[in-house]
């Protein structure tokens, strides 16, 4: 009789999974040109935005937009571009990007901030340069042509890049000799070095670094990256996995996307029966709900957000597994994971939601080793619990009974929790 009931209430069986990256991955292009020292050892690369395999900057592209895309696609995606991850990267920043402190989104030990030659030496730019220098960022003046207005910037700049073709090799060498004779501690980089003779002349004049076709043309690198929306989702999942959630940071992340903010407030207002007032802000939700409940609401909103282009049943499945693990967290085996139980269930389908391997995803989340093992291999008590839930989804009643025996659970108690989790997930879907 029990088996007939389960068969009638069995939930949706997921379809065959698509290939990884099919829906959420995009192709990005970046050109890199090496920067070398006097011994011709590569010290880093200048990164140049490209929108295709043609090795040229697209004429239609605004410089600020190009910088933003280069950063998002190569640094802020799910995993830094592996072809640039171990090198110091020289990145061009236009005036607006510097004023907005865009370089602060990147690790200071990995980049050199190039102040683009189109920048005007305004007070706003000077304040930005001062702050970046105080925060430990290396700064370079790109295609530098001296004018007194730039003099106050020089103490905060470590590298001065000079286009020896535009300035003229003799004039460039004379300028560098003069500055070094005055005691300048700046390092000078010769750009557009195209012959061995130019390299030797620039080196003897006092240039420290070199870049140009004589060493290497810019190399196009093509890779796949995850959409910015999914980057925000992973950042939020990382935050709610922490034992002590930084809700100030969570609020900032949620505020980056209007659709996500709306989903969160909709969840809070729809599902919180005991709140008599309408919740209109994240801070208000935190006050009324407390951290534990808000952790769950954020998880629900993010899962809904990233599953908008997926079958609704997949989102329903993520809710069902999350709620089942939450209900089972009261049992002895899982008390140590009570705070993360909901997330463990939800993360068991995260690979399907993001079209990315579970191995790659769990390494980016601050989870205990036994949780990672359960999600990757379905091993340990948590892995057995997830296996049990999956057997229920597939109407594998023999598997359900076997896993109940392994965990020491009463079959009827587990059945009730499974049905309750299924009912709860369906109710949530109806509410939203």
From Swiss-Prot:
Residues 1-232 form the EAL domain. GO terms for molecular function: cyclic-guanylate-specific phosphodiesterase activity. Residues 226-413 form the HDOD domain. Its EC number is 3.1.4.52. Disruption phenotype: Deletion mutant exhibits decreased motility. Mutation causes a slight decrease in flaA expression but does not affect flagellar morphology. Mutant has enhanced biofilm formation and vps gene expression. InterPro entries: dGMP_Pdiesterase_EAL/HD-GYP, EAL_dom, EAL_sf, HDOD, RNase_Y/CdgJ. It catalyses: 3',3'-c-di-GMP + H2O = 5'-phosphoguanylyl(3'->5')guanosine + H(+). It is an enzyme of class 3 (hydrolase). Pfam families: EAL (PF00563), HDOD (PF08668). PROSITE patterns: EAL, HDOD. Keywords: c-di-GMP, Hydrolase. Phosphodiesterase (PDE) that catalyzes the hydrolysis of cyclic diguanylate (c-di-GMP). Positively regulates motility and negatively regulates biofilm formation. This is Cyclic di-GMP phosphodiesterase CdgJ. The gene is cdgJ.
């Amino acid at each position: 009789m029990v088996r007939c009931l389960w068969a009638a209430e069995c939930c949706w069986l997921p379809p065959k999974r698509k290939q990884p990256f099919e829906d959420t991955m995009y192709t990005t292009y970046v050109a890199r040109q090496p920067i070398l020292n006097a011994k011709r050892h590569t010290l880093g690369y200048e990164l140049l935005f490209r929108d295709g395999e043609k090795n040229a900057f697209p004429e239609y592209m605004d410089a600020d937009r190009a910088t933003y895309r280069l950063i998002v696609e190569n640094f802020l995606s799910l995993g830094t571009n592996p072809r640039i991850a171990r090198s110091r990267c020289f990145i061009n920043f236009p005036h607006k990007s510097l004023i907005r402190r865009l370089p602060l989104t990147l690790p200071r030990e990995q980049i050199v901030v190039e102040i683009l030659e189109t920048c005007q030496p305004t007070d706003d730019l000077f304040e930005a340069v001062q702050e970046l220098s105080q925060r430990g960022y290396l700064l370079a003046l790109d295609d530098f042509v001296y004018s007194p207005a730039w003099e106050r910037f020089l103490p905060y700049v470590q590298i001065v890049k000079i286009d020896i073709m535009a300035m003229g090799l003799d004039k460039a060498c004379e300028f560098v000799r003069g500055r070094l004779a005055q005691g300048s501690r700046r390092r000078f980089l010769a750009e557009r070095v195209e012959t061995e003779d130019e390299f030797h002349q620039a080196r003897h004049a006092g240039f420290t670094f070199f870049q140009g076709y004589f060493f290497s043309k810019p190399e196009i690198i093509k890779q796949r990256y995850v959409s910015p929306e999914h980057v925000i989702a992973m950042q939020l999942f990382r935050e709610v996995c922490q034992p002590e959630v930084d809700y100030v940071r969570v609020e900032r992340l949620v505020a980056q996307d209007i659709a996500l903010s709306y989903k969160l407030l909709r969840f809070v207002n729809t599902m919180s029966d005991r709140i008599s007032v309408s919740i209109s802000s994240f801070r208000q939700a935190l006050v009324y709900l407390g951290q534990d409940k808000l952790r769950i609401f954020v998880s629900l909103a993010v899962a809904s957000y990233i599953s908008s282009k997926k079958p609704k049943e997949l989102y329903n499945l993520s809710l069902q597994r999350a709620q089942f693990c939450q209900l089972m967290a009261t049992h002895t085996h899982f008390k140590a994971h009570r705070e993360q139980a909901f997330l463990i269930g939800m993360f068991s389908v995260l690979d399907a939601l993001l079209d990315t391997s579970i191995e790659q995803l769990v390494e980016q989340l601050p989870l205990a080793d036994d949780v990672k093992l359960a999600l990757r291999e379905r091993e340990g008590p948590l892995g057995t619990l997830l296996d049990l839930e999956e057997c229920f989804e597939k109407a594998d009643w023999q598997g359900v009974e076997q896993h109940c025996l392994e965990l020491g659970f009463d079959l009827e108690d587990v059945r009730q929790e499974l049905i309750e989790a299924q009912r709860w997930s369906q109710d949530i879907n109806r509410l939203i």
